[in-house]
Amino acid sequence: MVPLSWSILLGVALFVIGAGGVLLRRNILIVLMSLELLLNSVNINFIAFGQYYDDFRGQIFAIFVIAITAAEVAVALGILVALVRNKSTLKVDDVTIMKG
């Protein structure tokens, strides 16, 4: 069994990398991937604490987060495709208004 501290360290490392990507990058696609890293780090911590406390609720929360993330990605990619068709850019700074 993996010690809890290793799982927490992995979750924190992924969270820091994801937060850095969201805050520092200007490409919308990279920002979306960084958000996925943030959510996956939370999933790792949910599962690690669930295993540590011998409770299955951490896994259930992780499954809910994965389902919500899948819906979020579907909507975000739809908006991204519409944005590329209208503006021909993926930079966050170039997109200031969402009206067509």
From Swiss-Prot:
TM spans (from-to): 4-24, 28-48, 60-80
Entry's Gene Ontology molecular function annotations: NADH:ubiquinone reductase (non-electrogenic) activity; quinone binding
Signal peptide: none
Function of the molecule: NDH-1 shuttles electrons from NADH, via FMN and iron-sulfur (Fe-S) centers, to quinones in the respiratory chain. The immediate electron acceptor for the enzyme in this species is believed to be ubiquinone. Couples the redox reaction to proton translocation (for every two electrons transferred, four hydrogen ions are translocated across the cytoplasmic membrane), and thus conserves the redox energy in a proton gradient.
Organism: Sinorhizobium medicae (strain WSM419)
Subunit comment: NDH-1 is composed of 14 different subunits. Subunits NuoA, H, J, K, L, M, N constitute the membrane sector of the complex.
Family: Belongs to the complex I subunit 4L family.
HAMAP family from the UniProt entry: NDH1_NuoK
EC number(s) recorded for this UniProt protein: 7.1.1.-
Record's subcellular location: Cell inner membrane
Bilayer disposition of the protein: Multi-pass membrane protein
Gene3D superfamilies: 1.10.287.3510
A GO CC term attached to the entry: plasma membrane
Protein name: NADH-quinone oxidoreductase subunit K 2
UniProt KW keywords: Cell inner membrane, Cell membrane, Membrane, NAD, Plasmid, Quinone, Translocase, Transmembrane, Transmembrane helix, Transport, Ubiquinone
UniProt cross-references to PANTHER family, sorted A to Z: NADH-UBIQUINONE OXIDOREDUCTASE CHAIN 4L, NADH-UBIQUINONE OXIDOREDUCTASE SUBUNIT ND4L
Top-level taxon of origin: Bacteria
One Pfam family it belongs to: Oxidored_q2
